[in-house]
């Protein structure tokens, strides 16, 4: 069986100071791997971030991008404002993406994850071709830096995501598999998606959720890992059977006891990995 590493997303702790976040991850949670988020303007001081991470001794499994102006209030809001789809902010978001891609190898990883934005299910929609072109441009820029564009699951069905990746046609495009997002957005069963996405999975989030009464219209609910409907034990088992050897990065984006919830997730994953 493949050996997997347990990590955590830095933003999940909800601690504003990166140094304090890293210390909590290492000393309180006892983890050695992080998925490092770039959601504000911190990327403009790359040496400060690189020095903090190196001093911590933590390994970076991937970097992660988020953008000012993304609105997650409703599914409809994020469909309108998310990722690389909005025309008025694309160039600014492209520039930030390239800047973080410059930092990524210096942190010891070649994986940059991002929600690229809603890709239309209808491939004849004019926005579909726009998203293909933009993804190619981004993938090419990342490729020049030895970095993979790793798209997070959730906003598209697995089938549409695969078709989109094939249309983009770049070897450095892969998937960050987030089982909870499949449920939160209402786009598909996570266990089935693992099998469909298979070799395209380059990084994994460990997050859980329960289904909405109105999938694709209203958000599902994020819950503590192992208490939702994602079937985390089966997902971990399938990933191992398929030969995935990367990081299982715990992500917790709800609740007021993040560190305690992450500690519960660590306990669950350790029991599953044996």
What are these regions (language model features)?
Residues 8, 20, 33-34, 63, ...:
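Acidic/histidine-rich catalytic cores of soluble enzymes
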Residues 247-253:
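Short acidic/histidine-rich active-site segments
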Residues 11-18, 36-48, 68-71, 119-123, ...:
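Acidic-and-aromatic substrate-binding clefts and catalytic sites of carbohydrate-active enzymes
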Residues 20, 72-174, 233:
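Active-site acidic/histidine proton-transfer and metal-coordination neighborhood
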Residues 8, 25, 53, 104, ...:
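Conserved, mostly hydrophobic/aromatic
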Residues 33, 111, 203, 246-247:
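Residues at the N-termini of beta-strands
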Residues 228-241:
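A short, acidic, amphipathic alpha-helical segment used as a generic capping/interface helix at domain edges
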Residues 1-99, 105, 109, 143, ...:
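N-terminal pre-domain/capping segments
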């Amino acid at each position: 069986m493949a050996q997997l590493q347990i990590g955590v997303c830095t933003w999940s702790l909800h601690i504003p100071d990166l140094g304090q976040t890293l210390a909590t991850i290492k000393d309180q949670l006892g983890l050695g791997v992080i998925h490092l988020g770039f959601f504000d303007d911190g990327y403009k001081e790359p040496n400060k971030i690189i020095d903090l991470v190196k001093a911590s001794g933590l390994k970076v499994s991937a970097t992660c991008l988020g953008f000012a102006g993304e609105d997650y209030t409703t599914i409809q809001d994020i469909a309108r404002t998310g990722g690389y789809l909005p025309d008025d902010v694309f160039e600014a978001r492209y520039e930030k993406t390239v800047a973080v891609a410059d930092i990524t190898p210096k942190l010891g990883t070649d994986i940059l994850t991002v929600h690229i934005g809603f890709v239309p299910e209808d491939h004849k929609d004019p926005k579909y071709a726009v998203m293909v072109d933009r993804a190619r441009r981004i993938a090419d820029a990342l490729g020049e830096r030895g970095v993979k564009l790793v798209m997070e699951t959730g906003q598209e069905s697995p089938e549409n995501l695969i078709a989109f990746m094939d249309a983009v046609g770049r070897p450095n495009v892969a998937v960050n598999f987030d089982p909870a997002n499949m449920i939160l957005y209402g786009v598909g069963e996570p266990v089935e998606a693992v099998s469909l996405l298979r070799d395209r999975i380059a990084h994994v989030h460990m997050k859980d959720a329960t289904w909405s009464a109105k999938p694709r219209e209203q958000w599902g609910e994020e819950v503590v890992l192992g208490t939702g409907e994602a079937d985390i034990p089966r997902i971990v088992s399938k990933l191992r059977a398929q030969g995935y050897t990367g990081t299982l990065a715990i992500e917790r984006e709800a609740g007021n006891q993040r560190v305690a919830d992450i500690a519960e997730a660590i306990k669950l994953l350790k029991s599953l990995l044996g």
